[in-house]
């Protein structure tokens, strides 16, 4: 019985080769793009045009959606399009990622509404651009940080559970640190709080993506988190952070975060390495040829 012929090596070139051989440089390049993408002054343009919040949200939606094309282009150039599909046993991964969605839903002002401490008043004509705006934030930021930065960090660390953990933490730390850019709008201690919870939501989105193997689960978690988080600021009146709301939000978040961490260490998510084309680092002197 003859042995099957070995697969031919596929030549690695272009941006995929850069991602694998100059990972740090590629991470830096993507972060620079992220800084530019989140700094587009669409709000100032809306004000200059004499529009209100609706125009600002429409411009934000259009701007962020268009800018999302670049990180999605990079996903294909890095040969990581597998993250737009799912891994084996993804159904179990969906169940394991449910705590991430609970964390996001916990960001809605549900308790103050039930207790009568706050009200949300929003017309349909206002909610449509708000809904699309929140979606575009999740699409842009997740395609950059979970679609590009996170897998690049997976290249940078060993291909094992510890390396995966470091990649989750490192990419989420970069995502959190990006929010320091808000200091250019004026110093506020709230910015540092935003950095902290952005790091945590980054970890949450990364785990949802790991469990399912699919980038759009991270987008969905981020979208839901922002949809609830900005709702009161845009359309609410009354008191948001009541004692009851703080307690419920904290307890639910801690329990769900604990479950996510437990699932991460219990579940074998190594299938994403092959699914997302995350190979071992090239040995010294490699000519850019992939493994068999």
Describe each model-derived feature in a short phrase.
Residues 33-42, 101-109, 172-181, 223-234:
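Aromatic-anchored segments of alpha-helical transmembrane domains
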Residues 76-82, 105-118:
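Transmembrane alpha-helix boundary signature
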Residues 15-31, 163:
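N-terminal membrane topogenic signal
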Residues 143-170, 207-214:
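Membrane-interface helix/loop boundary segments of multi-pass membrane proteins
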Residues 38, 191-248:
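Functionally important transmembrane alpha-helices
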Residues 24-77, 89-104, 120, 124, ...:
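Alpha-helical transmembrane segments in multi-pass membrane proteins
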Residues 58, 69, 223-292:
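C-terminal membrane module of polytopic membrane proteins
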Residues 1-20:
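Short, Lys/Arg-rich, polar N-terminal cytosolic tail immediately upstream
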């Amino acid at each position: 019985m003859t042995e099957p012929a070995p697969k031919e090596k596929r030549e690695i070139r272009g941006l995929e080769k850069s991602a694998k051989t100059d990972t740090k440089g590629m991470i830096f390049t993507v972060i620079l793009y992220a800084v530019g993408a989140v700094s587009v002054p669409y709000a100032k343009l809306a004000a200059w045009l004499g529009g209100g919040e609706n125009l600002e949200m429409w411009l934000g939606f259009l701007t962020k959606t268009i800018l999302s094309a670049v990180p999605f282009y990079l996903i294909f150039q890095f040969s990581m399009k597998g993250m737009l599909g799912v891994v084996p046993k993804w159904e179990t991964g969906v169940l394991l990622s449910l705590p991430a969605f609970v964390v996001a839903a916990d960001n809605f002002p549900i308790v103050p509404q039930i207790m009568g401490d706050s009200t949300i008043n929003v017309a349909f004509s206002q909610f449509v651009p708000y809904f699309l705006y929140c979606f575009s934030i999740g699409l842009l930021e997740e395609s950059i940080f979970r679609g590009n930065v996170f897998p690049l960090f997976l290249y940078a660390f060993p291909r094992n559970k510890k390396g995966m953990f470091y990649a989750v933490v490192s990419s989420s730390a970069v995502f959190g640190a990006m929010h320091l850019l808000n200091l250019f709008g004026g110093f506020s201690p709230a910015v540092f709080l935003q950095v902290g919870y952005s790091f945590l939501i980054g970890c949450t989105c990364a785990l949802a993506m790991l469990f399912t193997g699919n980038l759009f689960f991270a987008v969905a978690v981020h979208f839901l988190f922002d949809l609830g988080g900005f709702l009161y600021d845009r359309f609410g009146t009354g008191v948001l952070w009541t004692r009851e709301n703080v307690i419920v939000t904290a307890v639910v978040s801690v329990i769900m975060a604990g479950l996510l961490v437990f699932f991460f260490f219990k579940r074998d998510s190594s299938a994403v390495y092959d699914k997302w084309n995350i190979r071992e680092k090239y040995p010294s002197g490699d000519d850019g040829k992939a493994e068999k």
